[in-house]
Amino acid sequence: MELTTRTLPARKHIALVAHDHCKQMLMSWVERHQPLLEQHVLYATGTTGNLISRATGMNVNAMLSGPMGGDQQVGALISEGKIDVLIFFWDPLNAVPHDPDVKALLRLATVWNIPVATNVATADFIIQSPHFNDAVDILIPDYQRYLADRLK
């Protein structure tokens, strides 16, 4: 597939997602990094977003809860270029009914080449990166060329 460049803006659109057993871990991470996160636009699945907003007072664009389609909503935003970073603390020790949605969300984040953290250490690396508050170019699939090739 041919690639093109997308610029992640200095003010990032960050999706925050956590499975039930990981919500407290994400909450602690968000509270620790609140001064930095407040400079960006936050999205989250339903329960997680409401918990973050209630605990911190930050504005969070809450989707539906993950099992009700929230993971797919976040995935759609990623494919539309509206999410720049995904922080997703998923529980590797417990299966969830919407596992296919989880896999699809991670697949879309990979396809569209956005930074993804699935644990605290990686989330810390991303948010502490010297480029976190900078505009950054990434390579993404050239969908228009892909579509044109498919329609030949």
UniProtKB/Swiss-Prot annotation:
Residues 6-152 form the MGS-like domain. Inhibited by inorganic phosphate ions. Competitively inhibited by phosphoglycolate. Competitively inhibited by phosphoglycolohydroxamate. CDD domains: MGS. Substrate binds at residues 19, 23, 45-48, 65-66, 98. Changing residue 91 to N: Causes inhibition by substrate leading to loss of enzyme activity. Gene3D superfamilies: Methylglyoxal synthase-like domain. The active site is at 71 (proton donor/acceptor). Pfam families: MGS. Its main location: cytoplasm. It is found in: Cytoplasm. InterPro entries: Methylgl_synth (IPR004363), Methylglyoxal_synth_AS (IPR018148), MGS-like_dom (IPR011607), MGS-like_dom_sf (IPR036914). One of its GO terms (molecular function) is identical protein binding. GO terms for cellular component: cytosol. Keywords: Cytoplasm, Lyase. Changing residue 98 to N/Q: Strongly decreased catalytic efficiency. HAMAP family: Methylglyoxal_synth. Catalyzes the formation of methylglyoxal from dihydroxyacetone phosphate. Belongs to the methylglyoxal synthase family. This is Methylglyoxal synthase. The gene is mgsA.
